[in-house]
Swiss-Prot record:
Residues 23-115, 164-185, 279-330 are annotated as: Disordered. InterPro entries: Mucin-15. Highly glycosylated (N- and O-linked carbohydrates). This is Mucin-15. One of its GO terms (cellular component) is plasma membrane. The keyword Nucleotidyltransferase does not apply. Residues 254-330 are cytoplasmic. Residues 24-232 are extracellular. It holds the Pfam family Mucin15. Keywords: Cell membrane, Glycoprotein, Membrane, Secreted, Signal, Transmembrane, Transmembrane helix. It comes from Bos taurus (Bovine). Mainly expressed on apical surfaces of the mammary epithelial cells. Residues 1-23 form the signal peptide. The lineage of its organism: Eukaryota, Metazoa, Chordata, Craniata, Vertebrata. It comes from the Eukaryota.
Amino acid sequence: MLTSAKILLISILSSLLLFGSHGEEGQKTNTTESTAEDLKTMENQSVPLESKANLTSDKENRETSNPKASNFSFEDPSNKTHETGFYSNLSTDNSSRSPSLMPTLSPRSPSTHSFVSKLPWNSSIADNSLLPASAPPNTTVPVSSENFTLSSINDTMKAPDNSSITVSNLPSGPNTTSVTPMVTEGWPTTTRESMEGFTVYQETTLHPTLKFTNNSKIFPNTSDPQEENRNTGVVFGAILGAILGASLLSLVGYLLCGKRKTDSFSHRRLYDDRNEPVLRLDNAPEPYDMSFGNSSYYNPTANDSSTSAGGENAHDSIPMDDIPPLRTSV
């Protein structure tokens, strides 16, 4: 945003400068044309004189009486040209001023006003004095359009024989320079053509941001490394202490449980005496039926009593006569 605003301000200022330079060139050309026309009118005008001899004698008398005043003689064309150039330069200076810097113009000093010189033909120029004849040039400065109007300057020289010689600087047209103020409404659109004459400079202003990666690198502090090492040592010590405490508790629990198991019931007692039977059938209240197979392995005394009482012979083998034959498949 700031870069675009700067570019727009630079474009506006450059356009104002270009407009002012074109206005100055137009004023200079108008002033030059008016000065050339004034010189032509001065050359074309004829001066009625009484006689050539009187004119030359008066000129000699003026030069001998006041040599310094001879520079102001009317017949010297270079003097008049210098005066005309002075007024043209004055008008150029008045009109070429920038309206933005000098909105109002102050009246000029009386030395720049036009004057009337009474030069008698038969007397010295020292007896005469320069009298102001016309008002200062009218300078009109309207606020709305800022027009600078220069009035014509009349130089009148009177002779004692009631013959007047009038030289008037009348331009062909009013030397008016109108400068319209430039009004900018809103932000003008910038195109590629308008940006060709300008070089864009990148801003080097550092703007504060909210992202800070590492403050210790920008602002070094001697206490930060010690605090980091201290925190690391605390964490490592806590982890190591927890591991050692858990291992110690497990060892104590194992030792206590081992001692309790030795005092409790053990299955090894069953195998201490091999001769002691695990299950004895001699103490049975009723004798078992030992007719199936050889039951002497379990209770030989019961076997003897059963044979004497029942009269049945014990068979060592399993009888297979009662088993029906297998059916053959058809």
